[in-house]
Structures are given as structure tokens and as C-alpha cells.
Amino acid sequence: MKPVSPRVVAVLTLMLAAAPARAAPADAVLGRWATPSKHGVVEITRCGASICGRLVNGDDIRANADARDVNNRNVAQRTRRLKDLTIIQGFRPDGDKWTDGSVYNPEDGGTYHGTITIDGADALRLKGCIFWPLCKTQTWTPLR
């Protein structure tokens, strides 16, 4: 067996160093996450091949367990309870992120096109867009 030349070792080392970081496992998004506004807590679970998230707690819910979706742009939906309201749905796995989903924001009553990316063990980045480039990104932290 021939010894491996230093040139081959150097090329392999450079290729490994340049390789993209390993993608977060698809299930890394599952669990309870703290939102940056109104002390919200969203629980993300599997919904078939997709994921969905429901609002399980927040300032409005703590103040009134029967709080309603009063800001919804659809008047007929303003009587829905905020507790357990599905606010994330339809996302599909796409490499290291979840795409093509929708995010409902009960603070302004709008539904936005979304992308979810896991950033290490301590952050979920949720980007919601009216249409590109009119987007906003929030960073959520896991609740352990």
C-alpha cells in the first residue's frame, strides 16, 4: 500500500474545512419556545410531514385565560381563544430550515409567509414576510 502524499492530505483537509456545517436535525425545532414579545410561549409539534405551533401562554393569556383574538383582520375569527391558537402551520423541511409555511401574529392580526431556522441549541429564527423584502425576523429561545 502506498503512503498518502502530504498534498492529498492537505487537499482533503481543505475540503473538510470548507464543507458546510452540519445541518440541525429536523426535530430540533420541536418543543416550547419563548417569543420576544409579550412573554409568549409557543409549542411546536409535528403535524404530519409538517410542523405547527400553538400559543400556549403569554401576557394576554395570563391576564385573562379567556383572552380572544381581537386583532384578527377577519372579523369572524375575533372570538377565537388565544390559548392554544395555532399560529404556525404548513412548513416543510428544506435542508437546515423549514420553509413555505405561514405565521399568524395575534398582535396585529396578520398572517405572513415564513421561514424557520435553528441557530445552534439556543435559538430559533422565525422570519415572516408580507412579501420579500418586507420581512421581520424574531429570535425565539428554547424553554427547558
Predicted regions mapped to residue ranges:
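Bacterial N-terminal signal peptides that target proteins for export
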Residues: 1-10
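Bacterial N-terminal signal peptides
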Residues: 9-17
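Sec/Tat signal peptide C-region and signal peptidase I cleavage site
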Residues: 19-25
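Short, solvent-exposed mixed-charge patches
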Residues: 143-144
